């Protein structure tokens, strides 16, 4: 029996593997858990992982060799700012780059922005007037394009100056985002919403058209303000003159009291105040005050109260006139208006008096206390317009004052100056005038019609080419001769013969005759924009690209210098030089890519000259600018182009302004460089505290000269310290100017955020290629030399 048991145990042990096979799934799961708890396997896995990590480290080490590439990129970075593509916005970026380098455009936008900022400050002062508020909110919306352009110019110049002073901070690209301007364009024209491709010429016309409308609106408001000046009379008399005026009032009131009682019944005066307009209300009201002054000597207290109540009711009609003058000043005006009203009492007020009153405005001249003032009186103006016998302007003079009439025409030259140039920004730079002449072939009479233009659309191939293609069965693309830009302009200004059914009706001959029609240039702008008609309607094979407008890749020989004397109405010696080109690469108008090539010819237009930097540094150190809420929206009210470099190396207050602008609003820098630029201004703010405090100590010590020798020594030390800082800053400016002069006369290729330098030979080859490439010039910009 005991021998049987081992045999059974052996059998069981041998039979156990069969059970394992039957329960293999569960047993393998338990076995996997045991293996997971085994440390020997984990050690082997760690050894394998360490070997794998070592192999990875060996592979990562060669990747560190990419640093020389970054160094090369940093060395290849140019001190010119590109524009980030915000979704098929290459059409906008190319136009903005051309406008930025257009001579006179930045200064004109800056001047318009200063006018708008002053108007905004004036609107803040008049915010309590609810009637005018609704009208001027719409005008403020039209000003947004100027503000957006100015903020973009500021951001570009600020980024350019920061790169020139600290080039090691930028390794990838030098670009900013025109997001605010794009949003403004989308508000002005909903066509630009979304991310579709648009025509560069259309967006140029949209920008210039809105700028022109804004200039016209500003000009109308300026003329309106000049016309409203006569209604706002300001008087600042000397105290002695006030006493003389009061004495004259008492004498005149005693002298003319009986005349007032006879010629001015109470009922008529009250009715005039209810029915008449303008200054007649004021005259009747003042005449009542004269009566009250005379009767107060004999009236009781109750009567005085009653008359005072009647006198307090008219100010509700004209609160502004009363609030602007103090108590002695209206009294000084009472005698003057009273005598004038008596002088012209027989005349009825007419519409002519309202127009005559517009010819006078208030002037405040003289030295210190002396004042010269004009008062507008409709009756006196009417008498002046009818008889021309009055020589002292409006009204009689009081003993202490001299009245001098000032005409509106005499004030216009004062307001013209820079503002008139700013209001005509588009007209002066881009707008010219064409003359359409029609000559009758029978009587040789001429008729002319003038039209304004902002660009010239010229063909790039002959119109008969399509007919040749239809009739030709040999080649679908027949070879044509190379055309030139002068040929294209001659086609634009060609002489057209009107014959057949399109005959011209001559007013001299009184019947339809044959005629010749020509188009000539009468007035030429500073910048001529030539639009090459590279897109034409074609077959259905291009409908899939949208619009059915295919690209004409016919090359056109474009000269660097151009003269339009041949097509001008009068002889001229003006010549134009090519300074910018917008290129288009693609096959249709709704697809492809736009780039801009600009020639750097005038570095002074970049506002980076040495004098402006030093002056702005002294101003910035002495007077730091406050931080306003509007600056968070990207518009700096007191900011100008000359403060670009000082923002980088100036005091701490403007650096805060820039930090807030970079973080919150317009996103001056695109992509990763906003953080780097933010850190740049924070690091640059510490050394500026020393200069600002030193300059403050210098000014404080100068005001107190009797404070002792210690303060004088401190003054010398602080002045020496500021002198060292300024001299070091001048060295930086000279280095910046010298570095920019290297690019004088070179062509820059702006491909959105990328900026490259192209040789003149390569540029001419791309401008006038020998073959028919897909990249062809689309807009040519010539400036007057």
UniProtKB/Swiss-Prot annotation:
Catalytic activity annotation: Thiol-dependent hydrolysis of ester, thioester, amide, peptide and isopeptide bonds formed by the C-terminal Gly of ubiquitin (a 76-residue protein attached to proteins as an intracellular targeting signal)
InterPro entries (UniProt xref): Papain-like_cys_pep_sf, Peptidase_C19, Peptidase_C19_UCH, USP1, USP_CS, USP_dom
Polar residues composition-biased segments: 7-16
Domain USP: 81-785
Pfam families: UCH
Transmembrane feature ranges: none
Encoding gene, per UniProt annotation: USP1
Site location (Cleavage): 671-672
Matching CDD domains: Peptidase_C19O
Basic and acidic residues bias: start-end ranges: 258-275, 286-298, 708-719
UniProt GO MF annotations: cysteine-type deubiquitinase activity; cysteine-type endopeptidase activity; peptidase activity
Stated family: Belongs to the peptidase C19 family.
Record has Hydrolase as a keyword: yes
Region (Disordered) residue spans: 1-21, 33-52, 258-336, 693-723
Subcellular location: Nucleus
Descriptive protein name: Ubiquitin carboxyl-terminal hydrolase 1
Protein's GO biological process: DNA repair; monoubiquitinated protein deubiquitination; positive regulation of error-prone translesion synthesis; positive regulation of receptor signaling pathway via JAK-STAT; protein deubiquitination; proteolysis; regulation of DNA repair; regulation of protein stability
Active site (record annotation): 90, 593
Function: Negative regulator of DNA damage repair which specifically deubiquitinates monoubiquitinated FANCD2. Also involved in PCNA-mediated translesion synthesis (TLS) by deubiquitinating monoubiquitinated PCNA. Has almost no deubiquitinating activity by itself and requires the interaction with WDR48 to have a high activity.
Assigned EC number: 3.4.19.12
Entry PTM: Autocatalytic cleavage of USP1 following UV irradiation inactivates it, leading to an increase in ubiquitinated PCNA, recruitment of POLH and translesion synthesis.
Keywords: Autocatalytic cleavage, DNA damage, DNA repair, Hydrolase, Nucleus, Phosphoprotein, Protease, Thiol protease, Ubl conjugation, Ubl conjugation pathway
Induction info: Down-regulated following DNA damage.
Quaternary structure note: Interacts with FANCD2 and PCNA. Interacts with WDR48. Interacts with ATAD5; the interaction regulates USP1-mediated PCNA deubiquitination.
């Amino acid at each position: 029996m005991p021998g049987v048991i081992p045999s059974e145990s052996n059998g069981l042990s041998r039979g156990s593997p069969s059970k394992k096979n039957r329960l293999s799934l569960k047993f393998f799961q338990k076995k996997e858990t045991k293996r997971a708890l085994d440390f020997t396997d984990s050690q082997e896995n760690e050894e394998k992982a360490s070997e794998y990590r070592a192999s990875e480290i060996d592979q990562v080490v060669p990747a560190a060799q990419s640093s020389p590439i970054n160094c090369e990129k940093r060395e290849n970075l140019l001190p010119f700012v590109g524009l980030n593509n915000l979704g098929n916005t290459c059409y906008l970026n190319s136009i903005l780059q051309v406008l930025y380098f257009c001579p006179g455009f930045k200064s004109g936008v800056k001047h318009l922005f200063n006018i708008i900022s002053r108007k905004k400050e004036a609107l803040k002062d008049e915010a309590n007037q609810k009637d005018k508020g609704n009208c001027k909110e719409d005008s403020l919306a039209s000003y947004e394009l100027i503000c957006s352009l100015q903020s973009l110019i500021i951001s570009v110049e600020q980024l350019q100056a920061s790169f020139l002073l600290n080039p090691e901070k930028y390794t990838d690209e030098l670009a900013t985002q025109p997001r605010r301007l794009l949003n403004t364009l989308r508000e002005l024209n909903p066509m630009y919403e979304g991310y579709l491709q648009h025509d560069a010429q259309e967006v140029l016309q949209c920008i210039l058209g809105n700028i022109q409308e804004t200039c016209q609106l500003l000009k109308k408001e300026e003329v309106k303000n000049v016309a409203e000046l006569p209604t706002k009379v300001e008087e600042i008399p000397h105290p002695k003159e006030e006493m003389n005026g009061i004495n004259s009032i008492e004498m005149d009131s005693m002298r003319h009291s009986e005349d007032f009682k006879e010629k001015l019944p109470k009922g008529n005066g009250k009715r005039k105040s209810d029915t008449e307009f303008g200054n007649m209300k004021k005259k009747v009201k003042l005449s009542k005050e004269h009566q009250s002054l005379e009767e107060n000597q004999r009236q009781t207290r109750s009567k005085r109260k009653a008359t005072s109540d009647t006198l307090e009711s008219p100010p509700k009609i004209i609160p502004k006139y009363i609030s602007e003058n103090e108590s002695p000043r209206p009294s000084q005006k009472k005698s003057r208006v009273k005598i004038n009203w008596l002088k012209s009492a027989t005349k009825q007020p007419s519409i002519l008096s309202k127009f005559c009153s517009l010819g006078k405005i208030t002037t405040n001249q003289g030295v210190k206390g002396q004042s010269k003032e004009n008062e507008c009186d409709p009756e006196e103006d009417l008498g002046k317009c009818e008889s021309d016998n009055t020589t002292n302007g409006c009204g009689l003079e009081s003993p202490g004052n001299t009245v001098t009439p000032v005409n509106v025409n005499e004030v216009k030259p004062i307001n013209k100056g820079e503002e008139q140039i700013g209001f005509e920004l588009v007209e002066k730079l881009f707008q010219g005038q064409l003359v359409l002449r029609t000559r009758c072939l029978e009587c040789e009479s001429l008729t002319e019609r003038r039209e304004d233009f902002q660009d010239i659309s010229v063909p790039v191939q002959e119109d008969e080419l399509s007919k040749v293609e239809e009739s030709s069965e040999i080649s679908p693309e027949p070879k044509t001769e190379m055309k030139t830009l002068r040929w294209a302009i001659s086609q634009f200004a060609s002489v057209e013969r009107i014959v057949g059914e399109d005959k011209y009706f001559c007013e001299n001959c009184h019947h339809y005759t044959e005629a010749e029609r020509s188009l000539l240039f009468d007035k030429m702008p500073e910048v001529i924009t030539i639009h090459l008609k590279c897109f034409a309607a074609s077959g259905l094979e291009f409908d899939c690209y949208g619009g059915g407008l295919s690209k004409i890749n016919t090359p056109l020989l474009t000269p660097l210098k151009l003269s339009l004397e041949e097509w001008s109405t009068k002889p001229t010696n003006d010549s134009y030089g090519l300074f910018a080109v917008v290129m288009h690469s693609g096959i249709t108008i709704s697809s492809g890519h736009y780039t801009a090539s600009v020639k750097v010819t005038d570095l002074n237009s970049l506002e980076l000259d040495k004098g402006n930097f030093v002056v702005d540094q002294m101003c910035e150190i002495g007077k730091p600018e406050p931080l306003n809420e509007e600056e968070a929206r990207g518009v700096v009210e007191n900011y100008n182009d000359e403060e670009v470099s000082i923002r980088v190396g100036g005091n701490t207050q403007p650096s805060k302004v820039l930090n807030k602008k970079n973080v919150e609003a317009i996103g001056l820098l695109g992509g990763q460089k906003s953080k780097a630029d933010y850190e740049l201004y924070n690091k640059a703010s510490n050394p500026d505290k020393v200069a600002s405090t030193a300059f403050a100590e210098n000014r404080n010590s100068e005001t107190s000269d009797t404070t002792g020798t210690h303060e004088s020594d401190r003054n010398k030390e602080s002045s020496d310290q500021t002198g060292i800082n300024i001299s070091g800053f001048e060295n930086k400016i000279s280095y910046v100017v010298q570095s920019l002069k290297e690019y004088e006369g070179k062509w820059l290729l702006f491909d959105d955020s990328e900026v490259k330098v192209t040789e003149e030979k390569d540029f001419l080859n791309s401008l006038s290629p020998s073959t028919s490439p897909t990249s062809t010039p689309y807009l040519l910009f010539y400036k007057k030399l």
